[in-house]
C-alpha cells in the first residue's frame, strides 16, 4: 500500500553500526544463452507446498514472501488489504469512497491485531533455511506496526541478504522518472510503497551486489498481479522463477452489500472517535489534507 512519508522513530531505528560478514555462497550458475529459463506459477492454498519445495533446493534459492493475506490477515474488513482493493476500484460509488484512505489504513495498522493466514504459517516460514525476505507493498511509515504483528504472531526476522545489520532507506525512481518511492530494507522486511515487486527485487539485489548469488527465486504472494510482475521481471533478467499464488484467503469482488455496510459503519465510528478525541486530526482528514 502506497505511502511516502516516514516516521522519525523508524529513521532513528536504522542507525545501527554493527555488521557481520555475509556468508560465502558460490555464484549462481547463469543459464546459457539459448537455454530455456524455468518460469513456473502454481496456485496453492496451503503453505506446506512451500516447505516441500524448500526441502528440494539448496542455499542458492531465494525465497520471497508477501505479508498481507499471505502470511498475516486482518481480523476485520475495514482497513484490511481486501478493503483497500475495494476502495481503489474505479467504479466505486462516491458515497462509499473514503477520503485519505491511507491515513485510515495507518490508524488501523496501529490499532488492529492480525492473525496468521493458517495456523502453521509462522512455523513453515521460520523453517525455510534458505535466504529469504519479506517483500511488501506497504510503505515504510507502516513499518512499526508491520514488525509488531509479524513478531507477535511468531514470525522470525531473517538476516539481511548481504549479512549487514544496518538498515537501509533510500529514494528510488524509474528510469523514465514516471514513478518514484522511498524504499527501506531492515530486519529482512523490504517495504516498496506499492511499486512493481519484480522490479523492486532486482533493484534490491543490484543495490546489495547480489544479482549473481541465486540460481532461482521463489515468490509466495496472494496477489496475482504481483506473481505476474515478478515473472515478467525475472524472465527479462533470465532468472529462473517459481511463483506460488496463495489463494487461501477469499476476497470476492464486488464486495457483498453486508460487508460494504459494515465497512461504512466502522468508518463512521472511526470518524466519530477522531472528532471527539483528536479533533485536529479529524479536521485535517475531513478537509482532504492527507498525511500519507
Enumerate the language-model features and the residues they cover.
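Residue-level signal for mature regions of secreted extracellular proteins and peptides
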Residues: 12-13, 283
Amino acid at each position: 500500500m502506497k505511502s511516502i512519508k516516514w516516521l522519525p522513530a523508524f529513521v532513528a531505528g536504522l542507525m545501527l553500526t554493527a555488521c557481520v560478514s555475509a556468508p560465502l555462497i558460490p555464484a549462481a550458475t547463469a543459464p546459457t544463452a539459448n537455454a530455456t529459463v524455468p518460469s513456473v506459477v502454481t496456485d496453492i492454498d496451503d503453505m506446506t507446498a512451500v516447505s516441500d519445495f524448500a526441502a528440494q533446493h539448496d542455499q542458492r534459492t531465494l525465497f520471497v514472501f508477501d505479508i498481507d493475506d499471505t502470511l498475516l490477515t486482518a481480523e476485520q474488513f475495514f482497513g484490511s488489504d481486501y478493503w483497500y482493493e475495494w476502495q481503489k476500484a474505479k467504479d466505486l460509488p462516491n458515497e462509499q469512497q473514503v477520503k485519505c484512505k491511507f491515513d485510515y489504513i495507518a490508524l488501523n495498522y496501529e490499532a488492529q491485531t492480525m492473525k496468521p493466514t493458517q495456523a502453521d504459517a509462522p512455523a513453515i516460514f521460520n523453517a525455510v533455511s534458505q535466504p529469504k525476505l519479506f517483500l511488501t507493498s506497504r510503505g515504510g511509515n507502516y513499518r512499526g506496526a508491520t514488525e509488531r504483528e509479524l513478531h507477535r504472531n511468531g514470525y522470525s526476522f531473517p538476516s539481511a541478504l548481504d549479512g549487514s545489520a544496518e538498515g537501509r532507506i533510500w529514494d528510488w525512481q524509474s528510469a523514465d522518472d514516471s514513478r518514484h518511492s522511498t524504499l527501506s530494507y531492515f530486519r529482512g522486511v523490504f517495504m516498496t510503497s506499492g511499486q512493481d515487486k519484480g522490479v523492486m527485487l532486482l533493484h534490491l539485489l543490484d543495490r546489495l551486489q547480489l544479482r549473481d548469488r541465486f540460481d532461482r527465486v521463489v515468490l509466495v504472494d496472494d496477489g496475482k498481479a504481483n506473481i505476474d510482475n515478478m515473472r515478467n521481471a525475472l524472465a527479462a533478467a533470465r532468472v529462473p522463477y517459481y511463483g506460488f499464488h496463495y489463494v487461501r484467503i477469499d476476497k470476492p469482488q464486488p464486495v457483498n452489500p453486508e460487508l460494504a455496510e459494515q465497512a461504512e459503519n466502522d468508518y463512521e465510528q472511526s470518524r466519530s472517535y477522531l472528532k471527539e478525541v483528536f479533533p485536529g486530526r479529524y479536521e485535517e482528514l475531513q478537509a482532504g489534507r492527507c498525511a500519507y
